[in-house]
């Protein structure tokens, strides 16, 4: 009888273990999001396309669109529209007063809506040294950390290409953008020393800067809370003929324990939206 009871206990424990594993690993720990500005269609229609193809969130969403995304049963992966544009960021003290006012006003609203992340930018820098720009960013961002921590909202600074070139893709770069490499971004994270300040690693932009993407992820993943990606090199939708190994990228994110979103961010897709989204998500899901 005792042996039978023990056998039943073992079976029950095994059943619980299997179900726990299923709960944790049964779903992909990485969610795919669609960056709003990249797809030239109405927000509600983009939400429908996302759901049809296995995306779970919309990315870089302005305040007036937050409720639309929520009503469609999707998550706002990253809030946008609170900053003053990519060029006017925290490394320039001229914008501190307005930026601080904007973020202080919107962070409580983000918390009310259940939105966990909001983008911010270093801005362009033509006058300061890297260290001076770092100190300027610290001065501008530090007043926001307490309110962000209390609201459980993370400020996420995007890494962007500053490469100055006359090539066809010039519009997708930002000359003199300060936060153009993860070393500088990580230095800022360390100075701020807050769990509510992280980096947005844009794969297309960092590849454009000549970075070793896989090496960066291995070194700096603990400072990164969000990723953006587009077809490399043309910044279209993802394609199997691209020079970048998307499967290796996604597998590495899982290996380092990443459990956030990867935002699909091609450059202004106006035609063939459905097929672009479908093929891109298929590649990111390793199918």
Identify what each model region corresponds to.
Residues 1-7:
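Positively charged n-region of N-terminal signal peptides that target proteins for export
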Residues 10-20:
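Bacterial N-terminal signal peptides
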Residues 25-31, 36, 40-51, 114-117, ...:
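Histidine-acidic metal/acid-base catalytic patches
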Residues 28-41, 48, 52-139, 267-269:
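Structural motif corresponding to the early beta-alpha repeats
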Residues 75-79, 95-96, 136-137, 174-178, ...:
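Short, hinge-like loop/turn segments at secondary-structure boundaries
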Residues 76-78, 157, 201, 264:
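Hydrophobic residues in well-ordered beta-strands that form the structural core
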Residues 83-88, 125-127, 162-164, 230-236:
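Conserved radical SAM core fold
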Residues 92-198, 208:
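Active-site acidic/histidine proton-transfer and metal-coordination neighborhood
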């Amino acid at each position: 009888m005792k042996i039978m009871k023990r056998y039943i206990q073992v079976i029950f424990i095994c059943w619980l273990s299997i179900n726990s594993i299923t709960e944790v690993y049964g779903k992909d720990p990485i969610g795919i999001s669609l960056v709003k500005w990249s797809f030239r269609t109405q927000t509600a229609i983009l939400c429908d396309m996302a759901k049809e193809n296995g995306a779970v969130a919309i990315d870089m969403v302005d305040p007036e669109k937050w409720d639309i995304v929520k009503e469609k049963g999707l998550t706002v992966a990253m809030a946008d529209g609170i900053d003053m544009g990519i060029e006017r960021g925290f490394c320039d003290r001229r914008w501190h007063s307005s930026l601080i006012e904007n973020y202080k006003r919107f962070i409580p609203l983000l918390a009310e809506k259940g939105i966990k992340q909001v983008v911010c930018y270093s801005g362009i820098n033509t006058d300061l040294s890297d260290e001076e720009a770092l100190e300027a960013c610290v001065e501008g961002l530090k007043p926001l950390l307490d309110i962000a921590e209390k609201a459980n909202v993370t400020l996420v600074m995007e890494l962007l290409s500053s490469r100055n070139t006359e090539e066809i893709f010039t519009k997708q770069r930002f000359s003199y953008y300060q936060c153009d490499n993860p070393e500088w971004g990580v230095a800022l994270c360390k100075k701020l020393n807050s769990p509510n300040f992280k980096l947005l690693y844009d794969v297309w932009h960092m590849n454009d800067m000549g970075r070793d993407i896989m090496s960066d992820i291995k070194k700096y993943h603990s400072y990164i809370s969000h990723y953006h990606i587009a077809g490399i090199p043309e910044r279209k939708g993802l394609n199997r003929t691209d020079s970048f190994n998307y499967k290796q990228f996604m597998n590495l994110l899982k290996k380092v324990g990443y459990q956030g979103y990867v935002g699909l961010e091609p450059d202004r897709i106006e035609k063939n939206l459905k097929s672009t989204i479908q093929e891109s998500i298929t590649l990111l899901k390793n199918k």
